[in-house]
Amino acid sequence: TEGRTRGLALVPKLALDVMACEVLRALQLTDGFLVPISYVVPRKSLQEFHEDLFPDCAGTTPAATAQAWWAGDSEQVAKVSLHPARRPAEPFTSPLVPGARWVDDAAPGAGLPDAFPADGDRSGSGYSSPSSSLASPGSAATSLSASTGPSSGFASSPSQKSLQSILGPSSRFRHAQGTVLHRDSHITNLRGLSLTTPGESDGFCANHERVALPLLSAGGQITVLELSRPGRLPDTAVPTIQNGTAVADLSWDPFDARRLAVAGEDAKIRLWRIPEGGLRDTLQEPEAVLRGHTEKIYSIRFHPVAADILVSSSYDMTVRIWELGAGQDVLCLRGHTDQIFSLAWSPDGKKLATASKDGKLR
């Protein structure tokens, strides 16, 4: 793509175009553009859902409250299917379809399109169950001979087996191809991006609905752009978040697409609530302000399992875990003797790792 890369972010799996076999989408931030890059695994058919490419992933409902997590609750975030017909949907009614209603207690697969089989419908073709499909004697004989005959072509030869034992199993993603999406999906005419965001920060962050970008303007301004509204930004000023101080790091709440946490160089963390549908006016008052660090903050991360839990690291050599409902830090980890480059939760949320300038991983 054109221009120097200023940052990269991954779009959550729930926003992928699974029926096009899109397995990954990255957002590339350049000096004047936000460019989506799609990675697709080629498949002959795009009329059915390929379950081997899309295992169930973590949903957007927290597994525990902050209080339950502190009490030792080890529940994990429930997995959800990426199959379009199996995702939770809001009840839908239309005046154009009299009497249309949502049936919650329907049998599995009831009312689903043929292209989207239910969980219990896992035949080879993906369209009919074994109990309802009929085959002629000739086709059955052909199938039997194809599966048992020595020249069927389905059995691996000794040389193939030995090669597989040496190389190991091949990846289903080995033919994935990355493509820059059409310009109609780009966000262009970005202006005044911050070039001074610390190296410990990712520079910008994204969720499945929007992205947040720090600006060079005084007062730590942040612009929030809706991914559903690509195109050229106006030459005039756009609504922003007035953070009040330079941005050190920022992060979206994984369980609330409208809550943005921003760490500032004034040692405070501000929580901002984005209006439904995106920014229309400049925001000046945060939802909450977290105070506890005594020096500039390095980085912040939301907990991957429990709601309202945030961790931060600072130049004061401490790592603090915050309970957002209470608005205060409930645990302060000391022991670092040098700069903390980064920190990360384990996927199950039970462990926290930090990387430090002294070469130690804690």
Annotate the PLM regions:
Residues 1, 11, 27, 222-226, ...:
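WD40-repeat beta-propellers
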Residues 231-260, 286-288, 295:
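Blade-loop segments of beta-propeller domains
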